[in-house]
Amino acid sequence: MKKLILSSVALVALAGSSIAADLPSQKAPPAVAPAPLWKGFYVGLNAGGTFGNNSAVNGTTWNTNGPSNAAVMASALLSGSGSGSSGNAGFIGGGQIGYNWQARYGGYNFVTGAEADIQGIAGSGSDASRWSATNTDYLGQPVSLLSNQKGNANLSYIGTVRGRLGILIMPTLLIYGTGGLAYGGVNANVQNTQFWITTGGANAGSNSVITGNSPYSSTQVGWAAGGGLEWMFMQNWSAKAEYLYYDLGNAAGTAVNSYIGTGGFSGNNGLQSVTNYTGRVSGNIVRAGVNYHFNFANVAPVIAKF
């Protein structure tokens, strides 16, 4: 009896093993491919420097009134022009927001996107120019005019709205080009000092000093273009180095210079001149930044367990 029971148990175990071997195997579900690393919204901060010739000023000065408010006729205008330029450098810092798309084409991974940024600028520029003009017939008296002009133009802020197109040279390293609209707050001022010298006639040797200045402020719109490198150094975080060139067009204004009463004439006798000026607002930006990528597509799914 005992032998019969043991034989039955062995037979059942053997049959169970055979049935289990015939059952289809259950494979683990295939791994889900990770969503594109760069796709999605991002925000960040940046800081760096700006430099260039965005303080170049060109001016033309002419006299509208002579002593005693006598109008200077067109045939007797004392006029002169000059120009100057200088470098302009300052610190720049601000933030950006953007969106990336990632696609594979021809065996390469491309990243396209759009970005908007705005930065404050701490810096200024100035230049000076000197010119002279002579006229042999001002109310019958030969006179000469020597002008010293100093101008400056600077940006208080600059922002851009740009497209970006890049290629991944490594899964975590992007090289890109960028370009689009730029805008900025331009502040300019011209200060002009003139020396009016009567070289002949009854008032020969009489000298006068004229001085004045004119401020200018506006929001200029232009373009910007450049490129950079961006490195995804950890999940959702990237660092970038970027260069941009910007051109916001011309800033223009008029300075009215009034007699201040020195030299051969006394009191405010109406001696006056006008300076028109223009200055090109352009320059370079070199900056570094850090971005946080929201990358919602890469959020791990929640799997219920029972």
Outline where the language-model segments fall:
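Gram-negative outer-membrane beta-barrel domains
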Residues: 2-306
